[in-house]
Amino acid sequence: MGKKDKSKENKKGFRLFGKKRANRKDKKKNERPEICLSLSCTNIESLKEQIEEYKDCCQIVEWCVDSTLGSDDYTQEEFKTVLTEIKKLCKGKKLIVDYKGNEEVGNRIQRWAMGIADIIDIDADNSRLKEMVKEAKRKRTKTLISYHVFDRMPSRDEIATQFVKMERNGGDILKIACFASKESESYEILEAACSYTQLANHKPIVAIAMGEEGQASRICAGDFGSVITYACGSTPTAPGQFNARDLSRY
């Protein structure tokens, strides 16, 4: 057998589309997506601890509210008090509020977050999507419209079409995350994302291939137009996520 080409692998051993990746600090500024520390914590104390531990490794913090026990029962005053505390703790980092689950509860939480959080993550299939986007704009809060496929990798055409569809709904940032069952599928979603960014007046995008076979997409996303790449604290919030400290080294 011939010698393995080490230049085409990262420390985890997976190939990066035939390119040797530059160290993160050596890459051009416009090629480096911001790292979002995605936190799925069962209680507020743990959430605050994770922010303190990893805030030097990220530019954005995402609170996955549905993972916090009792979050469905928050009153508006309780939620805004907690969110304000978290926002202060982030100290200049952008804050995303995300809620996956019951749409009615999620929309209520997201409305309360407007004006405090910098960005709210709204599912592309939300029945009140346009209404939520308009309300967020009135309250000067950016919207990230997200679309997830957890069991397959759609075709490039499907992905590109979905980006355009989300753009028409008025989101400020468009995110698509799909599961990769083989490494080559990471290339599919990144190429589709890159094609979308060639369009005039395109919106900022995030493209992620979930799963272990999609990990390369989390490192080189910026080369294909993504403005954000997601990482975790002590516990992954999606398949294939890197720890924020590890990802920040690229």
Residue ranges, per PLM feature:
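Short amphipathic alpha-helical segments and helix-helix/interface helices
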Residues: I51, K80-K87, I109-M114, L129-K134, ...
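N-terminal acidic, proline/glycine-rich, low-complexity intrinsically disordered segments
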Residues: M1-K6
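Well-ordered, non-membrane alpha-helical segments in soluble/globular domains
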Residues: D73-T84, E104-R108, I159-A160, S186, ...
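Short beta-strand/loop segments at the ligand-binding rim of alpha/beta enzyme cores
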Residues: E31-L37, C90-K100, K139-V149, N201-V206
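Catalytic alpha/beta core domains of metabolic enzymes, predominantly
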Residues: N126-Y250
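Short, acidic/polar
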Residues: T42-Y54, E104-R111, S155-K165
